[in-house]
């Protein structure tokens, strides 16, 4: 067995990515004397924290949930969108038991399969590739009638792009119908403003629901209907008023698949279809043979889920506990779930020997008003715990760069970065004084890009995450990089365990980026 090297400290500077100092980068603009000294003295590299490096589609920004899940798992954890894309790519979607059962039953009973969701290539709530794959699967499965209830986007894509991709989709349906004999058509069209409300404005949902479930004599070309709405309201697709294109209605014994993979704007419509106690408005209640959701929208919903949540096993916290060691996880409120639930592989219950320290986030309207947030209090409690020797592994999240970055206020974001630097100047010496080592990283970028610059030179606040790589600093006198250039977040846990003299779990496919010289 390798010699133990403890205590170990993992510092996650939430939202602190790496980018050139271009005047839009609060991380580069901040005065960070302590971090600068670490870069000069200790081995360091960068890690991928977005796209395929964290189980997301290529080019998609990371986030705190995904970042912490990958950090703790020590392997790439594929997210729902990537899992669905992979199932389509390798053909395994055709064997998905939930889809197959729904299609078997409507085929046997001569009923209709209804597909509803956001008709968009945006990839934020849904993807057109997914509904096309479902139509094709149903046709090949022998389903005779497929009706699509299309919710138009206009937010995650250009406001008036819907007519173009609806035209392509209708051509796809016509081709499928001709080749297979399956009668596949667009039944209804609704802007997401109506069909995907998430603020309990039930009158909006009702407008879309009533059009979907009630039969209509209308025979409207979906593309023509959308274009007609553009002339009425140039705001475009998001606000397209619900209309029937070719709709016989939704009837008892039919089956429905909601193909959105993101839950938040799919929950209300799902409730109307499935909640027997629903009282948001007077509705025509229909007993469907199946109501399938692409992913889990809410664990309390009475639905079938095609791609249920999966969580990794034998993560960092499990390995620490299995070795009889103590661990302490700490953060302020805004990131407490990330450094506990998500870091621990989606498990709420603390591990054996795990202590959790929650510090309340400040009660301010927006965090640019207090950019240091609760970093001083988190720091004070963590340093005290280290000095008392309360754990073998310490894991801390500093929320500042992310939460203040989201406000879009550049000067405040600079102060947030400086507050994190000040915190590090206290916690890192504390762990070194105990003969331990520290790993410093981030879960994704944010404060590293605070403005978009328009063609006329004007600046507009950029409040989203970035796809930039994140830092990885190994604060240890004896550490030596292994030379891997394309590190990613999933390499952190194997590296930390190896440096501590502990064998990573067999499930950890991440690589070791540094060892003891």
What would you call each of these model-derived segments?
Residues 1-517:
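Feature captures the catalytic ectodomains and active-site-proximal regions of enzymes
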């Amino acid at each position: 067995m390798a010699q133990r090297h403890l205590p170990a400290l993992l510092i996650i500077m939430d939202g602190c990515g790496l980018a050139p100092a271009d005047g839009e980068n609060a991380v580069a603009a901040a005065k960070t004397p302590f971090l600068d000294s670490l870069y000069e003295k200790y081995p360091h590299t960068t890690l991928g924290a977005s796209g395929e490096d964290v189980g997301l589609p290529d080019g998609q920004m990371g986030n705190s949930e995904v970042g912490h899940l990958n950090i703790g798992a020590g392997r790439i954890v594929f997210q729902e969108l990537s899992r669905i894309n992979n199932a389509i790519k390798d053909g395994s979607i055709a064997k998905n038991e939930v889809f197959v059962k729904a299609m078997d039953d409507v085929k046997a009973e001569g009923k209709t399969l209804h597909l509803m969701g956001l008709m968009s290539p945006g990839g934020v709530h849904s993807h057109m590739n997914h509904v096309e794959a479902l139509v094709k699967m149903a046709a090949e499965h022998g389903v005779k009638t497929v009706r699509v209830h299309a919710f138009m986007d206009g937010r995650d894509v250009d406001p008036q792009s819907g007519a173009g991709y609806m035209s392509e989709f209708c051509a796809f349906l016509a081709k499928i119908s001709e080749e297979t004999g399956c009668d596949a058509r667009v039944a209804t069209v609704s802007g997401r403003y109506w069909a995907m409300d998430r603020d309990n404005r039930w009158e909006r949902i009702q407008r879309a629901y009533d059009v979907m479930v009630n039969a209509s004599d209308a025979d409207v070309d979906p593309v023509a209907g959308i274009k007609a709405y553009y002339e009425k309201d140039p705001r475009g697709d998001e606000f397209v008023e619900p209309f029937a294109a070719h709709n016989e209605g939704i009837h008892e014994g039919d089956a429905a698949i909601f193909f959105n993979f993101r839950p938040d704007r799919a929950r209300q419509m799902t409730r109307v279809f499935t909640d027997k106690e629903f009282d948001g408005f007077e509705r025509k209640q229909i007993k469907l043979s199946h109501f399938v959701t692409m992913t889990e929208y809410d664990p309390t919903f009475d639905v079938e889920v095609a791609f249920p949540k999966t969580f990794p096993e034998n993560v960092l916290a499990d390995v620490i506990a299995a070795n009889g060691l103590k661990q302490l996880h700490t953060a302020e409120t805004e990131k407490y779930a990330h450094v506990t639930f998500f870091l621990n592989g989606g498990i709420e219950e603390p591990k054996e020997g795990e202590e959790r320290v929650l510090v309340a986030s400040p009660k301010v309207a927006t965090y640019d008003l207090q950019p240091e947030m609760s970093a001083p209090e988190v720091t004070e409690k963590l340093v005290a715990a280290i000095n008392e020797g309360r754990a073998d592994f310490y894991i801390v999240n500093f929320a500042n760069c992310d939460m203040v970055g989201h406000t879009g206020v550049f000067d405040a974001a600079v102060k947030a970065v400086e507050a994190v630097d000040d915190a590090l100047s206290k916690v890192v010496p504390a762990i070194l004084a105990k003969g331990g080592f520290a790993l410093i990283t981030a879960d994704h970028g944010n404060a590293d890009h605070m403005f978009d610059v328009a063609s006329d030179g004007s600046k507009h606040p950029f409040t989203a995450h970035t796809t930039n790589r994140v830092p990885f600093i190994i604060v240890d006198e004896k550490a030596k990089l292994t030379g891997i250039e394309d590190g990613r977040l999933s390499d952190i846990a194997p590296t930390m365990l190896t440096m501590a003299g502990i064998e990573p779990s067999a499930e950890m496919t991440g690589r070791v980026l540094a060892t003891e010289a």
